[in-house]
UniProtKB/Swiss-Prot annotation:
Originating species: Ectopseudomonas mendocina (strain ymp)
Primary residence: cytoplasm
Keyword Cytoplasm: yes
Function: Endonuclease that specifically degrades the RNA of RNA-DNA hybrids.
Descriptive protein name: Ribonuclease HII
Enzyme class at the top of the EC tree: hydrolase
Taxonomic placement: Bacteria, Pseudomonadati, Pseudomonadota, Gammaproteobacteria, Pseudomonadales
SUPFAM superfamilies to which the protein is assigned, alphabetical: Ribonuclease H-like
GO cellular component, one term: cytoplasm
Note on how the cofactor is bound: Manganese or magnesium. Binds 1 divalent metal ion per monomer in the absence of substrate. May bind a second metal ion after substrate binding.
Amino acid sequence: MQLGLDFSLVEELVAGVDEVGRGPLCGAVVTAAVILDPLRPIIGLNDSKKLTEARREVLFDEIREKALAWCIARAEVEEIDRLNILHATMLAMQRAVEGLSVTPKLALIDGNRCPRLTVPSAPVVKGDSRVPAIAAASILAKVSRDREMLEMDRLYPGYGIAGHKGYPTPVHLEALQRLGPTPIHRRSFAPVRALLEPVAVDCIAATV
């Protein structure tokens, strides 16, 4: 359901929850939950996608310093492949809320559905541009995942991960065709699965 209130006025132990990384072909899906401190306002909170990288980095530190509580969580590639991306995202959101050092009275979830939580929750469509706490969560999740993708680029050179962050760009798809999937690629996603299926067929044929 959508709450009938001015989201910008929601304060007092309300956690904002968001995710980054549902669409990429590789890497974990990363989530964050944030309870802002109304006595320590943070200027310039907005959907992380609408901010420059430099601004996100500044806000990342400020959010962690000023928030009443925050937690960054994740679901790994293996969980995404086993559960599917939707259920893995819900699991990661659940972990983020449960990892808060302060129990919120309400969790506002970006999007149109909520994970199973032990506290009341409500979805907020486009919440990262409507609810400051969700915007803060989106910033923590995006900066964390982007940093991880830079490290993955060093571990798996040639795929351009630092640039596309795992999303299915032409550069990424061409590298997949040329180099094959890495251990961090999501086997359940169609472009990766399509590259692995001929291998499975060949293995079956070889045993006949």
